[in-house]
């Protein structure tokens, strides 16, 4: 089972940023996950409905928290069924209840900061910088 402490959360998020690029801006109203169908993938919209044609995993957008959790070993199919239901704290608690991971409380605050900025339309690199500043300042905006 994956345990996410703050160092692990930062590593996984930074891997996501490296993959997409620090200037990547998440298309908030776009499809968020892909579901495996043999070796192909289909977009899945925020409400969980399949959309569009099959695409490769490289083409399938996902939020920064979802990408990080996937990189940590949370199954894509589980993310598909659950991640659109809420924000970072909701997803972490749901995954913990499902037995997929455990996490430290400071992870919730840091990932929430990352997600807030991502959802406000800033780049993933800027979202991580914001979360790091919030952590340094004791999370005054959370």
What do the predicted segments below correspond to?
Residues 2-5, 19-26, 39, 45-49, ...:
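Catalytic phosphate/metal-binding cores of nucleic-acid and nucleotide-processing enzymes, i.e., regions
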